[in-house]
Amino acid sequence: MSDLLSRRLAQLGEPANLSLLGECLHGIERECLRVDHDGQLALTPHPQALGSALTHAQITTDYSESLLEFITGTATDPAATLAELESIHRFAYEKLGGELLWSPSMPCALPDEETIPIARYGSSNIGRLKYVYRKGLALRYGKTMQCIAGIHYNFSLPEALWQLQQRSEGNTQSTRDYQSARYIALIRNFRRYSWLLMYLFGASPALDKGFMRGRPHQLQELDASTLYLPYATSLRMSDLGYQSSAQSGLTPCYNDLASYTDSLRLAVGTPYPAYVEAGTKRGDEWLQLNTNILQIENEYYSSIRPKRVTYSGERPIQALTSRGVQYVEVRCLDINPFLPLGIDLPQARFIDAFLLFCALEDSPLLESGECGACTSNFLKVVKEGRRPGLHLQRDGRSIELKTWASELLERIHPLCELLDRSQGGNAHIEALAQQQAKVADVEMTPSAQVLAILRQGQSFTEFALQQSLRHAEYFRAEPLSAEQQQAFEQAAHDSLAEQAELEAQPKGDFDAFVAAYQASILALAV
């Protein structure tokens, strides 16, 4: 343990400060495809009974009309976050009729690209803009890639904790700048160590053969309809997913907030030749919002993002620049197909400890060589993380994954102890023990467990459909309370009314609306 981490832990362990760790906030976003009872992509519109995908706070769509996204609020206890996520699932299942929620991250057998429906958000200008943005994603990356689902884990530490540490360390930055710098330092450490999360929680070692759609790849055939890599942990996070030459130059090393926002400013304002050639329109039909490297900031694909809640009409870069970093969004977590929610409480407890470790441990700037090694380690683990004797790069030297993983878990142990002291019980130590067991025995990892079942003769699709049916039974077995049901019904009703109100307002010319939106991007790109 570094001296800096020891000092910070000792300070937070003082009786007057211990309660601060109970004020961390959590939120979860879970994506999942709607499928029919045969495991085929549901081509039906977003169910109106779920409310408006444009305005509902908890239930929306991601890329496709068939790709649901469930969003929790924030809570200090991840158990409450998961309870809310579960209630959203139960309400959704009540409205899905005979449809199912697909259990893994990698999609079901997909129809041809033209048939995959892009999400629609109504006739308002903002609704149409969201649709055109998704048309641009299809043009740039293909629809198939947009059907991959994941879990996003949002996490923040209380401002009082940052202020306490700033005072004790004699830092003279503004409170906002210090907090932002500490979150960016957390992200640097996350880049160093996130390969560990892929080993422990990666759950996508195989996929439906049709996913590759004839594109070249290095995957092996497990059966007539399943492709895999024998030691993979997360094909979802491998380079078979978002292969974007346009984004290849966008690899900020997160040495400060300004360098991150500057790289995004440049990307949203710089034309990319292939996109320029395609153009923004074909006749009167919009193809993409613009021809820049990124149409909007959120198009940038990364395993973690610094975030700040935006005001109405405000862009993410503007929020970060004017008010600093508020929380981080972890975006690399696979959906665990063995779990109804795709994530459980022990995993959430461990991620809390892991992120707290990243926040409190010393985090030197990432030099270019180390930045590249972080990317290389991550890609190596997602494609062959369970390979016996696999070595990674640490400080320019080779180290066995198992050795480094064991060392990291030992370094996280004091964080788990501190969290348990703060909150009572031993839930974090128990969550850590589960992860130590996976390092000791690779067969306990979710990716190994998926392949163990597939090797018994099930195809990826058969396995995924079986899990989806089991989870549907779980959610439908216990209905919501009358009070919860009424709250969800009201939220759905209110969201539809809000969309209708938006669409009833005079909206002006859509081309002018997009031009104004583009002008806001250009204003950022300075």
Curated annotation (Swiss-Prot):
Protein keywords: ATP-binding, Glutathione biosynthesis, Ligase, Nucleotide-binding
Family: Belongs to the glutamate--cysteine ligase type 1 family. Type 1 subfamily.
Catalytic activity: L-cysteine + L-glutamate + ATP = gamma-L-glutamyl-L-cysteine + ADP + phosphate + H(+)
Protein name: Glutamate--cysteine ligase
Protein's pathway: Sulfur metabolism; glutathione biosynthesis; glutathione from L-cysteine and L-glutamate: step 1/2
Example GO BP: glutathione biosynthetic process
Presence of the UniProt keyword Ubl conjugation in the record: no
Signal peptide range in chain numbering: none
EC identifiers of the protein: 6.3.2.2
Gene label: gshA
Gene3D superfamilies: 3.30.590.20
NCBIfam families documented for this protein: glu_cys_ligase
Molecular function terms from GO: ATP binding; glutamate-cysteine ligase activity; metal ion binding
InterPro entries linked: Gln_synth/guanido_kin_cat_dom, Glu_cys_ligase, Glut_cys_ligase
